[in-house]
C-alpha cells in the first residue's frame, strides 16, 4: 500500500458521534498511553512533519481526530489513556467518548495500539487490550521507539509485551521507529489486511 502524503487531511476533531464524518471509508483507530508517540507515529507513517500535532505535554489530544489518508482509509487519533494530570471527571468523559466510538462505530476495522518498546506494558495498556478483545476487535500492536533500544534486544522486548498482554494468536505485534521508519511498509501491509 502506498500513500500520497499530499493527500492527507484532518476532517474533524469530534467529541460526539453526531460529529463523526460520513466518508464511506473504513477506519483505523490509534490508541495508546499519553506520550507513547501517537502523533509522531501518524506523521511518520504519512510522511508529513506536522499533520498530527505533537507535544511534549502528555494528554494533549482531547478529541477524536479523523484524518483522511489519501482517500484510502481514515486514521482516528484517540485521546491517550493513563494520564494522571487530567481531572477524574475529564478522564471519565474521555473514557465514555472512546468507549462509544470503539463499541458503536461500524466503520472501525482495526485498532492500532501503540506501546513503548522500552517498557513493559502498563496496567492501562493491558486494560485497553482486554477491553478491545472483549468487543472482538482486531488489534495491531505497534511497539514504538525501537531506535531507543539495542538491536539485539528487540525480540526480547517484543516477547515481554506479548506475554504481558497475553496477545491472542490472531493479533500481530510489529516494532517501529519514527526516526528510521523501519517496518513502515510492513505496518501498512498489516493495516491493509484488515480493511
Curated annotation (Swiss-Prot):
Keywords recorded for this protein, A-Z: Cell cycle, Cell division, GTP-binding, Magnesium, Metal-binding, Nucleotide-binding, Septation
Positions that bind GTP: 32-39, 59-63, 77-80, 144-147, 176-178
Cofactor: Mg(2+)
GO molecular function, one term: GTP binding
Domain annotation EngB-type G: ranges: 24-195
GO CC term (a single one): cytosol
GO biological process, one term: division septum assembly
Described purpose of this protein according to its UniProt entry: Necessary for normal cell division and for the maintenance of normal septation.
Entry similarity comment: Belongs to the TRAFAC class TrmE-Era-EngA-EngB-Septin-like GTPase superfamily. EngB GTPase family.
Protein name: Probable GTP-binding protein EngB
Organism: Staphylococcus carnosus (strain TM300)
Amino acid at each position: 500500500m502506498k500513500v500520497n502524503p499530499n493527500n492527507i487531511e484532518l476532517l474533524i476533531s469530534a467529541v460526539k458521534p453526531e460529529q463523526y464524518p460520513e466518508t464511506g471509508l473504513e477506519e483505523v483507530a490509534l490508541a495508546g498511553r499519553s506520550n507513547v508517540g501517537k502523533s509522531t507515529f501518524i506523521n511518520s507513517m504519512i510522511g508529513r512533519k506536522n499533520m498530527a500535532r505533537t507535544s511534549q505535554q502528555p494528554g494533549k489530544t482531547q478529541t477524536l481526530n479523523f484524518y483522511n489518508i489519501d482517500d484510502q482509509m481514515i486514521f482516528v487519533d484517540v485521546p491517550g489513556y493513563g494520564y494522571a494530570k487530567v481531572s477524574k471527571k475529564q478522564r471519565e468523559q474521555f473514557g465514555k467518548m472512546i468507549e462509544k466510538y470503539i463499541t458503536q462505530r461500524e466503520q472501525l476495522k482495526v485498532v492500532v495500539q501503540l506501546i513503548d518498546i522500552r517498557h513493559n506494558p502498563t496496567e492501562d495498556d493491558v486494560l485497553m487490550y482486554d477491553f478491545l478483545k472483549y468487543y472482538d476487535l482486531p488489534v495491531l500492536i505497534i511497539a514504538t521507539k525501537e531506535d531507543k533500544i539495542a538491536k539485539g534486544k528487540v525480540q526480547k522486548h517484543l516477547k515481554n509485551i506479548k506475554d504481558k498482554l497475553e496477545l491472542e494468536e490472531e493479533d500481530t505485534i510489529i516494532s517501529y521507529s519514527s526516526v528510521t521508519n523501519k517496518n513502515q511498509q510492513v505496518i501498512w501491509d498489516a493495516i491493509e489486511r484488515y480493511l
